[in-house]
Regions:
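N-terminal active-site wall of soluble small-molecule enzyme domains
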Residues: 4
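Substrate-binding/catalytic cleft of secreted carbohydrate-active enzymes
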Residues: 7-9, 17-167
Length: 167
């Protein structure tokens, strides 16, 4: 009942999409989103070692372009952890693939544990080519995926229209 109330209340307030930020809900929640007509923006869970404030908060807001194959910079130096990430990403996609309301996959948000985001987008696309992918939501865009989302908190933002992706 609480799940239904929360989703219905968001619809009443005018929302048509909910973001599942770094977590996966029980399947019943997705069922109610399907039934009530609420779209879902699905993030993958964060991972990696302790994050550096410089890489997560400072450099990203300076607009610096950083390649995400610098694993130590993104707190992803552990190769076994990177392998495990793909195992869990595959499990999440397989679990939620038939969710009608699922509208967008997001493997990485704001650089938290980000690595090889272009490869992550390819991995997702091979498992599910029916939904758009925001490969690096917010910061450290690597030029891939279907969407370029910018999380801009501290300075005025000036929009530039992209030709190859939605922005």
């Amino acid at each position: 009942e609480a799940l239904i109330h929360d989703i219905a209340e968001m619809k009443r307030l005018g929302f048509n999409m909910l973001r599942k930020h770094i977590k996966v809900e029980p399947l019943r929640w997705y069922y109610h989103c399907d039934r009530l007509g609420m779209l879902v923006w699905q993030d993958m869970m964060n991972g990696g070692e302790s994050y550096s404030p410089l890489s997560i908060y400072v450099f990203s807001n300076l607009g610096l372009r950083v390649k995400d194959d610098r694993y130590r910079y993104f707190s992803r130096s552990d190769e076994a952890g990177r392998t495990h990430y793909y195992e869990e990403l595959g499990q999440m996609i397989d679990l939620l693939y038939n969710t009608v309301s699922l509208a967008l996959w997001v493997p990485f948000n704001e650089g938290w544990g980000q690595f090889d985001a272009l490869k992550a987008a390819e991995f997702i696309r091979k498992r599910d080519d029916t939904r758009p992918i925001d490969h690096a939501s917010g910061w450290y865009d690597q030029g891939g995926g279907d969407i370029k989302s910018i999380h801009w908190y501290f300075r005025p933002y000036h929009h530039k229209q992209l030709q190859d992706r939605k922005s």
